[in-house]
């Protein structure tokens, strides 16, 4: 926790964004140049998401990294 803000519960947003864009985990994993099980671990909150992956996801979904992390509502 930094400055009273929790950013360890971003993973539900990853799934919501993916589903809102009608994408499968496999499609997102291919975009990120990784295997689907690795992406699945991010989406389920089993692994911390690296900064470079976070940035690529924000670009893919045309949103901010702050939104993905739950720091803003858009």
Specify the residue positions occupied by each region the protein language model found:
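DNA major-groove recognition helix of helix-turn-helix/homeodomain DNA-binding modules
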Residues: 52-67
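DNA major-groove recognition helix of helix-turn-helix
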Residues: 32, 43, 61, 69-72
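A short, Lys/Arg-rich alpha-helix, primarily the initiator
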Residues: 1-20
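Alpha-helical residues within the helix-turn-helix
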Residues: 19, 30, 59
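Short alpha-helical DNA-recognition segment
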Residues: 22-41
């Amino acid at each position: 926790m930094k400055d009273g803000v929790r950013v360890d519960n971003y993973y539900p947003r990853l799934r919501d964004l993916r589903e809102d864009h009608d994408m499968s985990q496999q499609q997102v994993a291919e975009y990120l140049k990784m295997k689907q099980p690795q992406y699945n671990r991010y989406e389920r909150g089993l692994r911390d998401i690296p900064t470079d992956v976070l940035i690529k996801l924000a670009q893919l979904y045309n949103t901010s990294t702050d939104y993905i992390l739950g720091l803003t509502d858009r």
